[in-house]
Amino acid sequence: MTADIGATLNRNSWLKDSIVKIRGKQVILAGDVGGTKCNLALFSEKGGTLIPVFKQRFASKEFAQFDLIVKEFSRQAADHLGSERIIAAGFGIAGPVINGRVRATNLPWVVETETLIRELAVPNVVLLNDLGATGHSLEHLPPEDFCVLNPGVPEAGGTRALLAAGTGLGQSILVWDGGRYRVVPSEGGHSDFAPHTEQQIELLRFMRRRYPQVSWELILSGRGFRTIHEFLAPNVKHASFEDPDADPAPEITRRGLDKSCRVCADTLDLWTAIYGAEAGNLAL
């Protein structure tokens, strides 16, 4: 995803100017800021493209604020920077960005460009919605980075939709304006879940006993795996269920894919069906 942000930097006017001016002693900082992890990387310019020179991953919930991650990254990167200096930075963050400020989704963070400018001592910092950043990167990704699920012929200039389940459920739309794609960030993952089958109706009833509003994101995210598993088999527990801070999604996924647990396999099937339904909704 840091590569996505790196590609996104090329699409921003002031950063395009900055990239043109990059020399051997200048770098750009890019980051993907999520509810579970943060990926940060330094990029240098080579042949008109950005090349990662140092990258690091941090567990988001281990830090009280994002600027503390930036501070720790800067400390670790010092040896790699040498006499090089950061001249610009861009970060994709899960949440709506308003006037250079974003209250991160699924984290108790408020991130502001002014704070990061002071912390990094750089003149230019840009914050983007994370799926907006991904949208900007699509035209820069090589063919091997795509996996075709249903073969077809894309319509030239056709509207594109992005859906990404993780700690939350990110969405964005890309609209062709006649010259290039314009990215429209969306918080559609927080809209109300609409069940399609009797089983999904029962799932909604199950979740309404826990939440006043059941959104697509509550299901189509990492926590949704555990919720669906508990709905299908409330008395079946796995080792990762015992630790309140653990994420059982990887274990459920692994055991569902290798068919070592029938409930896990059923959980994957139901989760995937709902994911497909929401992808169809977004396409409409």
Q: What is the predicted role of each segment?
A:
Residues L131, A161, T167-K237:
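Glycine-rich phosphate-binding loop plus the immediately following alpha-helix
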Residues Q56-F58, V148, S191:
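Generic detection of short hydrophobic beta-strand segments and adjacent strand-loop junctions
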Residues T2-R85, E202-L284:
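ATP-binding/phosphotransfer module of carbohydrate and carboxylate kinases, centering on a glycine-rich
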